[in-house]
């Protein structure tokens, strides 16, 4: 009798782990219905995961094994590959081939790990010509994979919404010529704070478009949640493609209460969220210490407090 109970328990755990290991296989092609991100069965889905730091500053973490570890140990069901456009000697502008090699290592790692991946054009400025070329290439190469999400402009800083809108429409047009279905994320002015601007004048003529809001909990208070709530009420689909628990500078102490307030809010709204970042810079938002192996297998002592906390969140909420 005991052996039967043990076998049943073992079988249940095995099935659960197999289902967990096949996240994209289970949920498939994502789309937007109203303001909600949904899976292939039109069921609401919440993506939760981590963003890599700028590829041009922390390229050592841009590999398939690191992605696999984030899925296995952190329970990420999505990762974000943040391709630095101007910053660093190996930015996309200065070294496009190196940049694509690093970004594609994360993309391919996510596909192998059966999780979703955001291809993030990580810039604060308009680089239309370069962006069109890059997204044309990526959308031709990866259109057949439902894992793919495109983020066409990380954080516009001083551009107006009219400028961001015009830029985004051109990039969307390029992507949609090759990839008619996968989700596209569009940024908004003031480092993705002014989510009310696209709510007043959204992009039209395309489907499966979402708009990004970014927060750093120790800086951005309830006012930003209220602003986002109003945008959603107006019909705007929102995706939190970057966030964390410290100040907007990326440094300073973690504000655990403010962070939890944001987590509770996102969970109540079924908003997908990404935390910044997989890097080892000497600042609070970098989740890793210098001791961290480039390919994952990080021990507790390799994680900073932000890494320990976000892993706790991901393990708790990504139970599937």
Regions found by a protein language model. Give the residues of each.
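Aromatic-lined substrate-binding rim segments of carbohydrate-active enzymes
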Residues: 63-137, 176-178, 258-269
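Bacterial Sec-dependent N-terminal signal peptides
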Residues: 1-22
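N-terminal carbohydrate-binding accessory modules
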Residues: 21-78, 93
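Alpha-helical transmembrane segments and their juxtamembrane interfaces
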Residues: 12-14, 90, 252
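Extracellular glycoside hydrolase catalytic/binding regions
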Residues: 24-30, 54, 59, 77, ...
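Acidic active-site catalytic centers that drive phospho-/nucleotidyl reactions
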Residues: 39, 120, 242
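Hydrophobic alpha-helical segments, especially transmembrane helices
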Residues: 3-5, 21, 49, 81, ...
């Amino acid at each position: 009798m005991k052996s039967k109970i043990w076998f049943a328990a073992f079988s249940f755990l095995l099935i659960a782990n197999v289902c967990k290991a096949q996240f994209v296989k289970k949920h498939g092609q994502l789309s937007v219905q109203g303001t909600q991100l949904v899976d292939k069965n039109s069921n609401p889905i919440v993506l939760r995961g981590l963003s890599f730091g700028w590829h041009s500053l922390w390229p050592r973490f841009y590999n398939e094994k690191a992605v696999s570890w984030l899925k296995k140990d952190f329970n990420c069901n999505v990762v974000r590959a943040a391709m630095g456009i101007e910053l660093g000697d190996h930015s996309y502008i200065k070294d496009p081939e190196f940049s694509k090699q690093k970004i594609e290592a994360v993309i391919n790692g996510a596909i192998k790990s059966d999780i979703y991946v955001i291809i993030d054009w990580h810039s604060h400025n308009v680089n239309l010509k370069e962006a069109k070329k890059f997204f044309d290439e990526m959308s031709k190469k990866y259109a057949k994979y439902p894992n793919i999400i495109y983020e066409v402009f990380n954080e516009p800083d001083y551009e107006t919404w009219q400028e961001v809108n015009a830029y985004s429409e051109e990039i969307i047009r390029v992507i949609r010529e090759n990839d008619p279905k996968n989700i596209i994320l569009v940024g908004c002015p003031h480092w993705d704070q002014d989510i009310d601007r696209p709510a007043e004048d959204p992009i039209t003529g395309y489907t499966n478009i979402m708009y990004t809001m970014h927060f750093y909990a120790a800086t951005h208070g309830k006012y930003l949640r209220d602003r986002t709530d109003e945008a959603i009420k107006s019909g705007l689909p929102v995706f939190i493609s970057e966030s964390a628990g410290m100040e907007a500078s990326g440094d300073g102490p973690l504000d655990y209460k403010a962070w939890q307030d944001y987590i509770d809010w996102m969970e109540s709204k079924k908003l997908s969220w990404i935390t910044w970042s997989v890097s080892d810079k000497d600042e609070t938002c970098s989740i890793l210490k210098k001791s961290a192996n480039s390919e994952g297998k990080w021990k507790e002592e390799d994680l900073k407090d932000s890494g320990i906390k976000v892993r706790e969140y991901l393990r708790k909420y990504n139970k599937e």
